[in-house]
């Protein structure tokens, strides 16, 4: 899948789940399952409930995504 095919949206982390997964509520009200991208994991960036994040969604499965940025 090419990088241009992703959909970037903003959301808020609702709850942490096992294996670096998070339940994220998007701005439009949908709740999705998101995992942490490799760069965030490599740099040990902590993501807590209530954090505002940017999520990349695949056009093929809109219920799962990848957290690419955590706002300060």
From Swiss-Prot:
This protein's record includes keyword RNA-binding: yes
Modified residues (Phosphotyrosine): 60
One annotated Gene Ontology cellular component of this protein: cytosol
Similarity-based family: Belongs to the IF-1 family.
Assembly notes: Component of the 30S ribosomal translation pre-initiation complex which assembles on the 30S ribosome in the order IF-2 and IF-3, IF-1 and N-formylmethionyl-tRNA(fMet); mRNA recruitment can occur at any time during PIC assembly.
Function text: One of the essential components for the initiation of protein synthesis. Stabilizes the binding of IF-2 and IF-3 on the 30S subunit to which N-formylmethionyl-tRNA(fMet) subsequently binds. Helps modulate mRNA selection, yielding the 30S pre-initiation complex (PIC). Upon addition of the 50S ribosomal subunit IF-1, IF-2 and IF-3 are released leaving the mature 70S translation initiation complex.
Protein name: Translation initiation factor IF-1
Organism of provenance: Shouchella clausii (strain KSM-K16) (Alkalihalobacillus clausii)
